Amino acid sequence: MANICTTTIYVEGEKESVEKLNTLFDETISNKNNLNDKVNDNNTWIGNLLLNKGLFPYKYDTHRAFVCEYGEENDTTFYVLMESAWDEKMEAMDAVFDSVDKNMKPYYFAEECAMEYYVSNDIENKYFGDYYVDWFEEDYDLAVSSGELKRCRELVGDETFYTAKELRSSLAKLLHDPFTKLDKLIEKINDREEYNPEKTGISLGIHKIKKVTK
């Protein structure tokens, strides 16, 4: 089984285009038009979106790529969560979006944590920042008794994506260290030299997102 890459996409466009995109997903997932691939036998396969627009799916990399969630985020933004083998399948998804409206603008974040793969095209940090942060209670009782669960909730919060400035501010307060450079702090945290879960009960991981223009 290939490593699973999770991709989150926000697609911006005109209200009418977002509605058309939502209809395409609805009709594809339900196989309303009976156009879905019979061999693949999974209506959530992204190749079916291409088939429903009269496009040839095997022109693109659609390997083990499936829609998990989708919907209208608001009148001008559509949301997609998908899983695929190894990496994001944005060439195929771009073809889907272009088939509805070539002026639609997708922003995506792809994560394959086993390979330390964190990639986004969101250069503007509109949806996805410079860093991806995840934390959890490795030892709940210790996290509570040490007071670090409360501090982590207050200073790191439930956010997943941070700009460099936001992250530096949070870590300076969390670690009582306003002087060490951000990259060095992140290295120490990920190596468990700083904020060690054996002392805090909290497992904290910080990953820099590679920004691409494609």
Protein language model annotation of sequence segments:
Residues 1-214:
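Intrinsic low-complexity, intrinsically disordered or marginally ordered coil/linker segments
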